[in-house]
A protein has these predicted regions:
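N-terminal catalytic or cofactor-binding beta/alpha core of small enzyme domains
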Residues: 1-251
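Structured soluble/peripheral alpha/beta segments that form catalytic or ligand/cofactor-binding pockets
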Residues: 253-567
Length: 567
């Protein structure tokens, strides 16, 4: 990648000088090369982190090493093994700058700016720690990259300051920065016995207690241009000024240490969850031809929630968030997305940011989709569901935690509500399905799948079809309602509905909107998927609903722990 003996930094690395004892690094600020587009599941570059790092460097008067163009699929500047093999000069450059800072100031702060492709306004702080049972502990053999004083002082004050701006902070929730090859571990004693001179120089500074090193994983809401990004930069600039001196001016340091803090109050069920499932709500307005999907992860393990809105102009609106540690009675909440039982009905509410992508077809390549997207900072909706049979949040939660997806009943009905996107209000109504998330892959024990649901607001009721391709043939799944799918690909869907006494009826669906995806099941197997909404016709009846088709594709093996650690 880099010529041996090269003295000047390569064109893709922007270097900035500063007088403060701060070194900023943007390891993944580049973009995908044309060759990367041929990969089925390339690692996504951290869009906008180069610009954010540059702005922070100017405001903090900090030095900076900014990757502005190198594709992380060619050279991952956050992986020590790749840097040693292909860009060892980068470690020397880091060591030189840190030694100079420590000589002048007696200390240095290293701040690595990364991107987390979650939409919710969140930052995950990586210092080699993760939270277990309310306590911060080192993750999988990690060395902690900050001192106790910096952890309980500066970082606590930063978390409070971000919280006042509406930004949620966590320690190592997804990215603890504890992997052996993670760049943050360079600034600890983990590699003190290395034969590499630059590494020994850096660890010598660390051994003197002269370095504090922090990895910041900024969500989409904090990276894409908008008020939340401005608020995050303002908070970081204020608290981390002069290497963290801003915290002394802004904090009272009355916080309990995160290493010893007790667990937060959690209203647990009588018995701990045994299983998990994704609970989904899908709804479609046939007049506006707008379809939406929302879902919540329930039960064991970490999870989150999300919604996706598909429109006939080909655009898609997306929100994703992380599930918190607390739970609310008669409600499910993931950040600003909330589902609650209200007077015998289910009400879905949201006020917050969402990612707007003008062309849903770009989602076959996540980085391309993100590069064409913008942030809608204020999306709001309130949707009420009226079902044929009542359903409440607590019964759904209990079913998912006790039996998994099979413990969640399926209900069809109607919805009504209001939605505001981009300053435009929509009054909505139409058909809805509630139950196990229609599109969830879970542990996909099939090579392909095709399914549909359709509902008519008449006595005609609902139809469902669910088929799996196993052992070279299609097999009907449970809940297929005598409906067999013939073809399930945009722009049209064809199926056959077997009547009880009459001849088979033809089901024809015209696709209104859809999105192609590449996604993984719980075992890491890759699938290509097409999901969307359609208008259906069965003889004289009009139905409205959804379809999905997924098939397994080959993929290169994923790296072991690097994906979770390189950020």
């Amino acid at each position: 990648v880099i010529a041996e003996g090269q003295q000047a930094p390569p064109p893709w690395l922007e270097t900035l000088d500063g007088d403060a004892p701060i070194l900023l690094i943007a390891p993944h600020g580049g973009y995908a090369e044309p060759e990367t587009a041929a990969l089925l599941a390339p690692r996504v570059n951290d869009l906008h982190t180069a610009d954010i790092t540059r702005e922070l460097a100017i405001r903090l008067d900090a030095a900076a090493l900014i990757n502005t163009a190198m594709d992380r699929n060619r050279l991952d500047c956050n992986r020590l093994d790749e840097v040693v093999a292909h860009a060892p000069w980068l470690l020397t450059m880091i060591a030189d700058r840190l030694e100079q800072m420590v000589a002048e100031h007696g200390r240095a702060l290293v701040l690595a700016v990364h991107g987390w492709n979650l939409v919710e306004a969140r930052v995950d702080i990586g210092v080699g720690l993760t939270k277990r049972a309310g306590r911060l502990v080192p993750s999988r053999g990690a060395h902690v990259s900050v001192s106790d004083q910096f952890l309980t002082g500066t970082l606590n004050v930063l978390i409070d300051r971000l919280g006042r701006a509406g930004i949620v902070s966590t320690f190592g929730l997804r990215y603890p920065a504890g992997g052996a090859q993670n760049l943050m571990q360079v600034f600890t004693q983990r590699h003190s016995a290395s034969s590499i001179d630059a590494l020994r120089r850096i660890t010598a500074l660390s051994g003197r207690g002269a370095i504090e090193a922090v990895q910041l994983e900024l969500s989409i809401a904090l990276r894409f241009p908008g008020s939340l990004r401005d608020a995050a930069i303002e908070a970081l600039s204020e608290i981390l000024a002069n290497g963290g001196d801003g915290a002394m001016r802004n904090g009272n340091h009355s916080h309990r240490s995160h290493r010893t803090a007790g667990a937060p109050t959690i209203h647990l069920p009588r018995s701990a969850p045994r299983k998990s499932a994704r609970f989904g709500l899908e709804f479609y307005d046939p007049a506006l031809r707008i379809g939406a999907m929302a879902s919540f992860d329930l039960g064991v393990g970490r999870g989150g929630g999300r919604f996706m809105i598909l429109r006939t102009d080909g655009s898609v609106l997306l929100f994703t968030g992380e599930r918190g540690s607390d739970r609310e009675s008669a409600a499910l909440r993931v950040g600003p997305l909330r589902l609650r039982t209200d007077g015998g009905r289910l009400r879905l509410e949201f006020v917050g940011p969402a990612l707007l992508t003008p062309d849903a077809a770009t989602y076959v390549n996540i980085e391309r989709a993100l590069s064409q997207s913008s942030l809608e900072t204020e999306v709001t909706f309130t949707i009420d569901f009226t079902l044929g049979t009542s359903l409440d949040v607590e019964s759904v939660r209990a079913g998912a935690e006790g039996e998994g997806a099979s413990g969640i009943p399926v209900r069809f009905g109607n919805f009504s509500g209001r939605m505001r996107i981009g300053g435009r209000d929509h009054s909505m109504s139409g058909v809805a399905r509630i139950g196990p998330a229609f599109t969830a892959l879970d542990d996909a024990a099939f090579d392909a799948r095709r399914r549909l649901w359709a509902f008519a607001d008449t006595d005609a009721g609902a139809i469902q079809a669910n088929e799996f391709f196993v052992d070279a043939r299609w097999h009907p799944g449970s809940g297929s309602d005598r409906c067999r799918i013939i073809a399930c690909e945009p722009p049209a869907i064809h199926a056959s509905l077997t009547a009880i006494r009459d001849e088979d009826q033809t089901v024809v669906g015209q696709v209104v909107s859809h999105i192609p995806l590449v996604r993984s099941d719980s075992r890491g197997r890759r699938f290509r998927t097409s999901i969307g909404f359609a208008d259906f016709a069965i003889e004289r009846h009009r139905y409205f609903g959804m379809f999905e088709t997924s098939w397994r594709v080959d993929n290169r093996p994923s790296t072991s722990d690097s994906e979770a650690e390189t950020g």
